[in-house]
């Protein structure tokens, strides 16, 4: 059941930021700010005294920073979801990914100066993330318990469609994705012999550090995708924030193509753009994976992947921070297999044995 209202605590060392966020998110009657604080110590104290439904926590603060406070909260096993506020710097990005490893459900970037703040924008982002998180917790479709999802009506089980060998793996994810992708990439074998193209909804300024972090945990090379570079096997390519990632053929090879055209489904990069480009270039020779995240980006394209004879996988509800995009894909009939995050690579390897490379 969604708390009504959702009781929020805001922790930031700037009084102005606390007031801005408090005023903005309470414009929605479903959210009520019950307390605010300015240090990590305040965070721990208010979490225990107020037992809020959600905490909005700044990364960088005096006395005790947000990372330390988050780590302490996790040790106390209070089970309160935390959304981090992170400045758009290299240090801020690295601290943010560490916070996600510690258990934060998501993050929202903020400018380094309060004078650059767009109060309405940051308020809308926080409201949507908070409400999407709680709404996802009351949706329990029966399919999520199945390993093999129901066949899509246009592509019945045992379809006559010719399924060609797999040439690429495409993964789309949003809220909860950084931690889930780290889990997936840590399990990819060094000799996977395929390129892996990733769209993670993430602001510009964070994706390069994120790709580096994935690379540190993976046996294959992982990098932020660059426009015009050749697509190589045993390499993961992460779409840059604020750029669509697509594929183009030239001289008998596949190449990365980035563009800054209009957002699709409210996102740039968009999972839909990547999957539709992969369908055009690889036809049925793709595995499409849709993972944790709010919204519907990629769900319609996953249906098209399955229609053309590609293989499709969704992360299950139990291991998703938000069962949103993947839920949409399942309900639309676009998903062939539903797996916990720890089993996605196992399923991919089974598909590769069945279909070849």
Swiss-Prot record:
GO terms for biological process: chemotaxis. Phosphorylated by CheA. Phosphorylation of the N-terminal regulatory domain activates the methylesterase activity. The active site is at 174, 201, 297. InterPro entries: CheB-like, CheB_C, CheY-like_superfamily, Sig_transdc_resp-reg_Me-estase, Sig_transdc_resp-reg_receiver. Residues 162-344 form the CheB-type methylesterase domain. Its EC number is 3.1.1.61, 3.5.1.44. It is found in: Cytoplasm. One of its GO terms (molecular function) is phosphorelay response regulator activity. It is an enzyme of class 3 (hydrolase). Contains a C-terminal catalytic domain, and an N-terminal region which modulates catalytic activity. Belongs to the CheB family. PANTHER family: PROTEIN-GLUTAMATE METHYLESTERASE/PROTEIN-GLUTAMINE GLUTAMINASE, PROTEIN-GLUTAMATE METHYLESTERASE_PROTEIN-GLUTAMINE GLUTAMINASE 1. Involved in chemotaxis. Part of a chemotaxis signal transduction system that modulates chemotaxis in response to various stimuli. Catalyzes the demethylation of specific methylglutamate residues introduced into the chemoreceptors (methyl-accepting chemotaxis proteins or MCP) by CheR. Also mediates the irreversible deamidation of specific glutamine residues to glutamic acid. This is Protein-glutamate methylesterase/protein-glutamine glutaminase 1. The gene is cheB1.
């Amino acid at each position: 059941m969604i708390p009504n209202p959702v009781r929020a605590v805001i922790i930031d060392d700037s009084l102005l930021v606390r007031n801005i966020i408090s005023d903005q998110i309470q414009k929605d009657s479903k959210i009520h700010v019950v307390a605010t604080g300015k240090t990590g110590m305040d965070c721990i104290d208010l979490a225990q005294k107020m037992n809020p439904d959600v905490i909005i926590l700044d990364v960088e603060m005096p006395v005790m920073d947000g990372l330390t406070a988050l780590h302490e909260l996790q040790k106390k096993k209070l089970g309160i979801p935390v959304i981090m506020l992170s400045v758009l710097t290299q240090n801020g990005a690295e601290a943010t990914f560490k916070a996600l490893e510690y258990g934060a459900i998501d993050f929202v970037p903020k400018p380094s100066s309060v004078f650059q703040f767009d109060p309405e924008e940051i308020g809308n982002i926080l409201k949507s993330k908070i409400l999407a998180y709680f709404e996802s917790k009351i949706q329990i479709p029966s399919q999520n318990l199945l390993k093999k999802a129901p066949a899509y009506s246009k592509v019945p089980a045992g379809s006559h469609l010719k399924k060609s060998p797999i040439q690429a793996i495409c993964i789309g994810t949003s809220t909860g994705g950084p931690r889930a992708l780290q889990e997936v990439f840590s399990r990819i074998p060094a000799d996977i012999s395929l390129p892996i193209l990733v769209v993670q909804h993430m602001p510009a300024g964070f994706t390069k550090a994120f790709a580096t972090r994935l690379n540190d945990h993976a046996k294959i090379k992982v990098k932020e995708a660059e426009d015009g570079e050749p697509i190589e096997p045993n390499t993961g390519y992460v779409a840059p924030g604020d750029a669509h990632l697509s594929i183009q053929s030239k001289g008998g090879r596949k190449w990365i193509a980035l563009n800054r055209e209009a957002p699709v489904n409210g996102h740039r990069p968009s999972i839909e753009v990547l999957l539709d480009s992969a369908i055009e270039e690889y036809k049925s020779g793709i595995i499409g994976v849709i993972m944790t995240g709010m919204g519907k980006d990629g769900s319609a394209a996953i249906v098209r992947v399955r229609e053309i004879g590609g293989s499709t996988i969704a992360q299950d509800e139990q291991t998703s921070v938000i069962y949103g995009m993947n839920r949409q894909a399942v309900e639309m009939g676009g998903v062939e297999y539903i797996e916990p995050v720890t089993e996605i690579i196992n399923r991919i390897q089974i598909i590769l044995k069945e279909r070849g490379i």
